[in-house]
Amino acid sequence: MHYLAVVVLFPLLFWGLSLGCGLLVERLAGTALPSLLVLPVGFGVLVVVSQFTTWTAPTAPLTPVILLALALLGMTVGRAALVQRWRARSGGWWLGPVAGVACYLIVAAPVIFAGRLTFSGYLLDTTGAIQLAGAERLLHHAHDFSTTVPIYGTTLGAYFGNGYPSGGHSVLASIGWLSGQDLIWLYSPLQALELSLAALVFAWLARRAGLSRLMATIVGTVASVPALVYAYALMGSIKEMTVLPMLVLMGALIACASELRTAVGVRAALPFVIAGAAALDAIGIAASPWVALFGAAALLAAVPLRGRRDIRSFVIGGATLAAGTALIGLPTVGPLSKTLKLAEGVSNSNATAVSDPGNLLRPLKFLQTLGVWLGESHRVEPRYLNQTYVLIGIVVVCIGFGFLWLLRRRSWAILVFLTASVIVWALLHRHGTTWTDGKLLMLLSPIAVFVALIGAFGVMRTRGLEGLILVGAVLVGVLGSDALLYHGTNLAPTQRFSELASIGTRYAGVGPTLATDFEEYDLYLLRKLEVDIPGAAYSGPFQFAAGFSGQYGHSYDLDALALPSVERFRTIVMRRSPAWSRPPSNYRLLWRGRYYTVWRRTGPAPLAHFPLGTGFTPSAVPPCRVIRRVATQARQAGGRIAYAQRPLNLPVDLARSVRSPAIFPSTDLEGRPQFSFGGPARLEAGLRVPVAGRYELWLAGDVDRPLEVLVDDRRIGAPSAQSGDDGTVIDVAAANLSAGPHSIRLLRHGGDLRPDDAGSTVIDGIVLAPPGAAAEAETVQSVAPSAWRSLCGRPLDWIELT
C-alpha cells in the first residue's frame, strides 16, 4: 500500500496542487496561460509560498495546509476556466500532458520497476540524508538549526544554517506531509515529477516552433531526460531538479510575453516573477544570471523599443519584474550576505572548492551536454565509446538543422531563449569549479537535445526517411543512455532502511545514541535518538583505542573506540555482523532484528576494558599471562573479572581464491583483499572446518543481482539488492558442515532488465560463524580474581575489570 501511495498517489497530489496553484495565478494575472504552462507556474507557487511559510517557526508547520488551501482556492476560482478549456479542446489535446506523464515514468522507472519502496543513486551522493533531514526540520522548526544534538545539529547548521537554498526541500516536506509517506521514499519520485513539468514546457515550446502535437510530445519527453539530466536525477540532485523546470518556464514565457502583456498589461509579469523567484529559492543567488537575462528578453519581447513611450513602459516593466522577483524571492534574497558567501564558497575563487570535485571522478566533458552517454555512469567514459561518439555526431548535425528550422520559422523568442542559456552557461563556467561546472553542463543539456530534436523532426517534415533516421538516432542515443543508467543505478536497501526507521520510531527520545556503522542515512532515520557516528564528517568528540584513528566513511567495531567514548552513550545501535564485538558488560540487549541490534546502558561503566580479537575474528584465546595481569589489577581494585565468551569465527582467505577474469582485485578501507564483479563471474575458495556443526555463512560487501552461494556444490542462498557503506555484511544462510575441508563458490550470472541489475557486486569477506558467535548471542559472566585460571584456553571477545 505504501508503494502505491508513493508511485501513484503522491504524483497525483503533486500535479493536483500544481494545477490548483497555477489556476490561481491565472486568476490573479487576469489572463489564461498556455495550458501546458499552468502546472509549471503552479509549482513555482508551491516553491515560493513554502519558502515564505517556512521562514518563521510559527508558520512552518502550517505550510502543507496553506499549500492545500491555495490549490483548492485556485480550483474554485479557476473552475470556469477549466470547463472552458475542456469545451474548447481540440483533437489530440491529451498528447501534451502525455509528455509529462511519460517523463515521470522514465525518471521514476528504477523505483517503479523495483516494485518496492526504495530510491536510486544510493551511496553515490553522500548528502542525501542531509537533504532529507533538512527538509524535515524546515517543516517543524523553520530555519532554526540551533540544536545541541552533535552530528545532527552540526551537519544541518553547516548546510542550511549558512544560506543553503531550500526551495525543493520545503516542497518535498510539505507534500510529503500531505501524502502521509516518509520523505526518504518520496525523494526520487519528487525529482521525477519536477522533470515532468520541464517536459510540459518543452512540449509547448516544440508546438510553438511549428511541430505537430505528436512530435511536440516526443520532443518534450526526451528533451527533459538527456543522459546527464537523468544521471543527476537518479543521484538525487534536488536543487538542480527543482530549478530546471523554472529555467525552462522562464524561456517559454519569453515566447508568450507579448500576448500576455497585450491582454492584461503589467499583471502579465506575475508568472515570470514567480518562476524567477522560485529559481532563486531553488539554487540561490546562482540563478540570478538566468533570471536577469531571461527577464530582460521577456521584457523586450513584451515591450519592443520603438519610441519614447516604449522606453517608459520598458522601465516600468523592468522595475516591476525586478521588484516583484526580489519581493517574492525574499527568503533567498533577504539574507543576501549569507547567500553571497555561499555562492563564493563554491566558486573558483575558493581554493577548497576548486580542490573538491564532489563525487565526480573527473571533470565532465562538454560533449556530455549533447544527451548521449552509453554507460552506467556519467562519471567515467561510456561503456560503448564508439557508438556514443557516433550518436553525438548525429546530435550535433541535428542541432544545426534545429537552428535552421527555427530561423526559417522566425521563432525569434525561442532562439533568444536558447542563446541566453548558452551565454549564462559561459558566464558561470568562467567562475565554476569541477563540481559546479558539471551541474552547469547538466542544466544546458536539455536545451541541446531540444534543438536537436527540433532539427530532426524538421528534416522529417521535408525529407521523411532521412528525418526518421535522424529522429530514431537521437531517441536511441538519449533513451538508450537512460536505460543503461537505469540498469546501473544502485537502489537503497528497503528492508534494512525500514528496520532502521522502526528503531528510530520505537526508541525515540532515548539518546544519546551511538551508531558505529557508517551509514549516512542514520542521520535522518535515527534523528530522534540523538545519534552520533564516529565515521561521519561532522561527528562528535571520539577517542580511539590504540592503533585506530577517526576517518571519514569508516565503520568501527566498539573495541576500536576508547571506553569513555562508548560509555557516554545511553543507547547503541549496531549492525548484526560476525566482525562486531559485544558492547561492554553494562549494556544489555534491548532488541534484535534481521539487520540491527539495540543495546541499553544499565549500570556503571567497567573500570577497564581489554579487547581481544581483530577483523572478522572478534574473539581470541588470550594468553594466561594476560588474564593473570587483569586478575592482579582486579584484586588490587577490589573488583571482579567480567568476560564475554565467544566461539572463534572461520574467515575465508580470499587472497588464495580462484577467480574469473571478470573479477577485479583491490583492497578495502581496512586493507583486506576486495573483489569487484564486472559481469557474470565465479569466485571459489576453500577452508578447513575444525569441528562439525551448524555454521552461519556471511558475505562482506555489496550485492546487486542475485549472487548464488554454494558450499560443496550445494546451493545455500542467493542474496540480492543488499548494499551499504563500509562494513556491510550479508547473512546468507546456515549450513551443517562436517569437520574437514570445504569449498565455497560465488556465482554471479547474467543480468536482466531490472534496475540495479548492473549496479555493484563487491566482496571483501566470507565468514563462517559457529552457533553463539554473534555479539547478541554472548552472555556476560564474571569470576573472582582468584579464579582467573578458569579463563585460560577459552575464546573470549573481551575481558573487563568491574
For each feature predicted by the language model, list its residue ranges:
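Membrane-embedded, hydrophobic transmembrane alpha-helices
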Residues: 1-94, 568, 797
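Membrane-interface helix-loop-helix junctions at transmembrane boundaries of multi-pass membrane enzymes
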Residues: 85-89, 93-94, 207-209, 214, ...
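Active-site lumenal/periplasmic loops and adjacent helix-entry segments of GT-C-fold
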Residues: 102-246, 383
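Transmembrane alpha-helical segments
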Residues: 105-106, 282-287, 331-335, 426, ...
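Hydrophobic/aromatic-rich transmembrane helices and adjacent perimembrane loops
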Residues: 129, 192-193, 240, 244-246, ...
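Signature aromatic-anchored transmembrane alpha helix within multi-pass, membrane-resident enzymes
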Residues: 267-276, 316-326, 450, 456-482, ...
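Hydrophobic, aromatic-rich transmembrane alpha-helices
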Residues: 298-306, 316-326, 369-411, 458, ...
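Short periplasmic/luminal acceptor-recognition loop of GT-C membrane glycosyltransferases, typified by
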Residues: 476-481, 486-497, 502-549, 565, ...
